[in-house]
Amino acid sequence: MPENYTPAAAATGTWTEEEIRHQPRAWIRSLTNIDALRSALNNFLEPLLRKENLRIILTGAGTSAFIGDIIAPWLASHTGKNFSAVPTTDLVTNPMDYLNPAHPLLLISFGRSGNSPESVAAVELANQFVPECYHLPITCNEAGALYQNAINSDNAFALLMPAETHDRGFAMTSSITTMMASCLAVFAPETINSQTFRDVADRCQAILTSLGDFSEGVFGYAPWKRIVYLGSGGLQGAARESALKVLELTAGKLAAFYDSPTGFRHGPKSLVDDETLVVVFVSSHPYTRQYDLDLLAELRRDNQAMRVIAIAAESSDIVAAGPHIILPPSRHFIDVEQAFCFLMYAQTFALMQSLHMGNTPDTPSASGTVNRVVQGVIIHPWQA
């Protein structure tokens, strides 16, 4: 870790704030490093990607799992390859349901520490189940088991993130977004690379700058008891991650939920009352956006929630009919790029809500029952 890596400049004096703020710089550092590794990456990946029946699973635990939820749909449609997202927590408990020995597998394991018991076990199970198995761990910790095991394996290529993304705060912030950007750059370099992604970094930097010292809050302050994040497609993954940030940093004092706008009508909408904040991540795709705006207008007509906020790249009559945030000006972003912008608001909201509720964001679990690196997991050996 660099000697000058301190939270001294953070208004809140927390690692969490520092780690939120340095994200745009960390992304460009990582993608520049991937540029330098491109030849070695291609040597490893190109023979695999030529296999017609190759399965590519994006995996991780908790926030690391949500990376796959956010980017796998776009990677699958963009590349035509068989990308899917399966958490390590599912791979470990039900390997027989997800690991098919008849198909070669590339397992992309995301991990901040690289030491989560399920992450290490998932790699071992994949090797055990699938005769032709390859690994691309993307991790923030050079000393972690994911990285160390991979550099000593013939069937793996280890991708290490910049040291500052190994977040010291409890919640994953710069770690998730840097691993996410890096994976996109690996598999879609013509769209996501160190040059094109500067637009994303600049827009997110503008968001963070616009929030000043964070003291005003992102969505204001009100006595809400629950928050719901809504997003379509991969943005539902961003909504899920946004909800988890609130749960983690407030230690569950603010109940948080997520769904897709269309799915929300099918029962979950029952939770909305006059103590509920609803945040809608509006898609940049003109077709999908219609569904987001339909639900946004419906929630406002219902007049049941305390506040319904839209975050969108551009305004419209429906967006502007109530509380809303318009992203800073930039070129057109596809949703997988826009997800980074939405996460800037969500991370900052969770941080400030934590402080507002009297929590310590870097160590929010006063009881110690929830840990930065998960503890208490017993890994049981597979028996066919």
Swiss-Prot record:
Q: Which reaction does it catalyse?
A: D-galactosamine 6-phosphate + H2O = D-tagatopyranose 1-phosphate + NH4(+)
Taxonomic superkingdom? Bacteria
Q: Which residues form the SIS domain?
A: 45-197, 215-364
SS bonds (residue pairs): none
Q: Which Gene Ontology molecular function entries are recorded, alphabetically?
A: carbohydrate derivative binding; hydrolase activity; isomerase activity
Q: Does the keyword Hydrolase apply?
A: yes
Q: What is its EC number?
A: 3.5.99.-
Under PANTHER family, the record lists:
D-GALACTOSAMINE-6-PHOSPHATE DEAMINASE AGAS-RELATED (PTHR32502:SF3), N-ACETYLGALACTOSAMINE PERMEASE II COMPONENT-RELATED (PTHR32502)
One CC-aspect GO term: plasma membrane
Ordered alphabetically, the record's keywords are: Hydrolase, Repeat
Q: Supply the name of the protein.
A: Putative D-galactosamine-6-phosphate deaminase AgaS
Classification via Gene3D superfamilies: Glucose-6-phosphate isomerase like protein, domain 1
Pfam families this protein is in? SIS
What gene is this protein translated from?
agaS
Q: Which family does it belong to?
A: Belongs to the SIS family. AgaS subfamily.
GO biological process per UniProt: carbohydrate derivative metabolic process; phosphoenolpyruvate-dependent sugar phosphotransferase system
Q: What is the lineage of its organism?
A: Bacteria, Pseudomonadati, Pseudomonadota, Gammaproteobacteria, Enterobacterales
What CDD domains is this protein classified in? SIS_AgaS_like, SIS_GlmS_GlmD_1
Q: What role does this protein play?
A: Catalyzes the isomerization-deamination of galactosamine 6-phosphate to form tagatofuranose 6-phosphate and ammonium ion.
